[in-house]
């Protein structure tokens, strides 16, 4: 199969598209044109590759997790170490690319939303690097949960706006960031943090994150002489997963597994499992699976991990699900916390809570596979930002 999506209108099957007010249509089309031009511009690509190597620190290692593999008792588990990027997560792969695009369009200001704060930090970082003015919108709840990242963004020169509307989380931060963009569209570029939003954002973010899968594919071939049997990544909006999945999409022997946040359980109201529990709707400029009530009102997503509690999911993930190309699963808060501790103790790596969801499912999956098989898990970020939150939760049981 040769996979080609999106179509010229930005649709992935019935998902995606461009549902934006007239005031943004010009900006979105301008972005589309600049992005298409940049793909065939050798100077742009050279500069992008320079910053990915010299500033971000790519390529990231593909690490054989020997002890974790022994614990699972099945397939070999390789970790794609996106936690080793500058700023500690995969987010910067995308913000570097979009900042260069903004500069090419002559825009000196950037705006972004953030949940866990990782995308905010990555945006503030590239804004400092390229001397741009930066405004970050963050839900008030997330500001409390991730106060360290707020301070980091301010250190980097960004203005952080705490959003008090709605559920005061990521969804509301996106709403406010989009409003801000509408009002300042002439000199401001919106750096979308995931494979979400109106076309061409899902495609742009996918392409900048695809460096994950391109490297992992090459590295696994070098180490094992074959492609992995499975690849696994956590899914909130879904950019680290799409970055890993997309370069493998035509390799049908490779199973692709996305892992959503089940929060307190799918049977409760407290989860962020959009693919499992969502229905098609329009959110933030695109048609996607959305958590909604019977009246079409957007529900609040819930997860211990601030980076996964988004009530929608990138349109291409829903398309993969419909095609049967990827399978989507969910992992509860408790299971993620258990996997967090497991990776700390088996490999000496403190993972982000987001990535811990992928680790949890990967260990289960590996145990059902044969020792001669192998998998790649995207370790999308490091867990420094989560240690404080987990300290409160685990105090007293850590040495039990």
Curated annotation (Swiss-Prot):
Q: How is the subunit organization of this protein annotated in UniProt?
A: Tetramer of two alpha and two beta chains.
Fetch the PANTHER family from UniProt. Answer: TRYPTOPHAN SYNTHASE (PTHR48077:SF3), TRYPTOPHAN SYNTHASE-RELATED (PTHR48077)
**Lineage, please?**
Bacteria, Bacillati, Bacillota, Bacilli, Bacillales
Name of the gene this protein is made from? trpB
Q: What is its EC number?
A: 4.2.1.20
**Which N-terminal stretch is annotated as signal sequence?**
none
What this protein needs as a cofactor is:
pyridoxal 5'-phosphate
The pathway it acts in is: Amino-acid biosynthesis; L-tryptophan biosynthesis; L-tryptophan from chorismate: step 5/5
| Superkingdom of the source species | Bacteria
The family classification in the record reads: Belongs to the TrpB family.
Native species = Listeria monocytogenes serotype 4b (strain CLIP80459)
User: What is the reaction catalyzed?
Assistant: (1S,2R)-1-C-(indol-3-yl)glycerol 3-phosphate + L-serine = D-glyceraldehyde 3-phosphate + L-tryptophan + H2O
Q: What is this protein called?
A: Tryptophan synthase beta chain
Return the InterPro entries for the record.
Trp_synth_b_CS, Trp_synth_beta, Trp_synth_beta/beta-like, TrpB-like_PALP, TrpB-like_PALP_sf
């Amino acid at each position: 199969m040769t996979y080609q999506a999106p179509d010229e209108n930005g649709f992935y099957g019935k998902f995606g598209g461009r549902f934006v007010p007239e005031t943004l249509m010009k900006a979105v089309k301008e972005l589309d044109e600049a992005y298409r031009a940049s793909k065939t511009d050798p100077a742009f690509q050279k500069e992008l590759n320079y910053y990915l190597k010299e500033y971000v620190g790519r390529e990231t290692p593909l690490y054989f997790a020997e002890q974790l593999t022994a614990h699972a008792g099945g397939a070999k588990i390789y970790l794609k170490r996106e936690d080793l990027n500058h700023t500690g997560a995969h987010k910067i792969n995308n913000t570097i690319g979009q900042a260069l695009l903004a500069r090419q369009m002559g825009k000196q200001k950037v705006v972004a939303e953030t949940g866990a704060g990782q995308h905010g930090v990555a945006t503030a970082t590239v804004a400092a690097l390229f001397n741009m003015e930066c405004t970050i919108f963050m839900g008030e709840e997330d500001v409390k949960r991730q106060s360290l990242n707020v301070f980091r963004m301010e250190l980097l020169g960004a203005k952080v706006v705490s959003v008090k509307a709605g559920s005061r989380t990521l969804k509301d931060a996106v709403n406010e960031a989009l409003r801000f963009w509408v009002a300042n569209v002439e000199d401001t570029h919106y750096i979308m943090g995931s494979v979400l939003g109106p076309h061409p954002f899902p495609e742009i973010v996918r392409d900048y994150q695809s460096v994950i899968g391109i490297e992992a594919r090459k590295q696994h071939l070098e180490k094992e002489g074959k492609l992995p049997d499975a690849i696994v990544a956590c899914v909130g909006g879904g950019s680290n997963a799409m970055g890993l999945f997309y370069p493998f999409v035509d390799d049908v022997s490779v199973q692709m597994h996305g892992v959503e946040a089940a929060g307190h359980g799918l049977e409760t109201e407290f989860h962020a499992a959009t693919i499992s529990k969502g229905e098609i709707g329009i959110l933030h400029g695109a048609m996607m699976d959305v958590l909604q009530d019977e009246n079409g009102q957007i529900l609040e997503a819930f997860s211990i991990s601030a980076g996964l509690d988004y009530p929608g999911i990138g349109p291409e993930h829903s398309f993969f699900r419909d095609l049967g190309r990827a399978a989507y699963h969910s992992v509860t808060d408790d299971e993620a916390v258990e996997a967090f501790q497991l990776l700390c103790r088996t490999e000496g790596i403190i993972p982000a809570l987001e990535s811990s969801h992928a680790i949890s499912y990967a260990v289960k999956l590996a145990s059902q596979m044969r020792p001669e098989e192998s998998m790649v898990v995207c370790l999308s970020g490091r867990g420094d930002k989560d240690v404080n939150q987990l300290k409160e939760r685990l105090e007293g049981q850590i040495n039990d």
